[in-house]
Each structure stands twice: as structure tokens, then as C-alpha cells.
Amino acid sequence: MSLRFSRPALVALLLSGFPLWVACGQEPGGASPAAKKSTPSWEVYFSPHGGCTEAVVKALGGAKTTVLVQAYSFTSAPIAKALVDAARRGVKVDVVLDKSQRTEKYSSADFVAHEGIPTKIDAAHAIAHNKVMVIDGTTILTGSFNFTKAAEEHNAENLLVIQDPVLAEKYAANWKLHADHSEAYAGK
């Protein structure tokens, strides 16, 4: 990546204390060797009826080692089934959900918890509004898309599928931060 700055703009950035590594998209010390080899890519989906659920299920179907889930609302049967299928293939699946999922009438939280997937409730916030999956430490699924039937069929939503191990590492660290203060959920 190459950025061009006029001399006054560069001087102003440096004098303001703005970290030059941010402007250039590099972290101090550079990225890990594996991250340097990969080129980030992304796909975008929109709903209603834009293939968001299908994209999530496809990504979960390709998971090999880990799936970390953070969700506000989780009622999608196809996504819940894809998580269980991944766990049955030996993928380590962990789920953190908003506290509303304890009482939601049609939550898939009970299904995945009863299937043996470690499920936690994040009650430390007014709402735990993240909609994120981190797959195999390289792929992030995120956007406004809730993992629900309504999000696929009725709502105006978006989903990004991002291939970027450096960004995935940051999302995984945030997931862990929330998992650490969340309570285990065994289902109803």
C-alpha cells in the first residue's frame, strides 16, 4: 500500500501526534508473516432475500477449526443447524449471545446449548448488539444482519464476509473480552 502526502499535510500529521503507522495501514513491527502473505478480500450481501443466510451457512460449512459467534438476536434455524453441523465435524464452536436470548420465545440459543455447543449470555451491557462470526481465525462475518429469519426475509440488512487474518485477530480478541465476562447458558 502506498500513500502520498503533500509535505505540509505530512508535517501536520506528524506534529499532531497522529501515528504514521495508522495512516499507512501498518501496525508497529509489521503484520505477522502469515498475514503479510494474504490479501484481504470481502463479499457483501443485502437482505431481504439477498443471500445473507445462505452466505453464513456456506461459510460455516467451510469451517475447519474454530467458529466464534457474537449475536444480539439468534432465531435462524438454518444458521443454528450449520453451527451444530460444524461442531459435529470437530470444529470448536463457541457462542456469546445477548441476555434477551434467555427469554426469547423462538431463540436458537436453547437448540445450540442442548446440542453441546458452549453458549454464554453477555448481560454486562444494555444490549450486546454485536453480529459477528470469526471462522478459523481468518474470516469475519459482520454487519447489521441479525442471525434471524426476519433479517433474511423482511428486514433491510447487510452482511460482510471478510477474509483478513489481521482483522480476524482483532475481532477474536473482542469476542474473548465479551466471553470472559459472560455467564454460561445451558438452555431452558
What are these regions (language model features)?
Residues 73-77, 99-103, 125-128, 139-140, ...:
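Solvent-exposed loop/turn segments at secondary-structure junctions
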Residues 56-118:
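Primarily the HKD phosphodiesterase
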Residues 1-11:
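Bacterial N-terminal signal peptides that target proteins for export
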Residues 135, 139-188:
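Signature of lipid phosphatidyltransferase scaffolds
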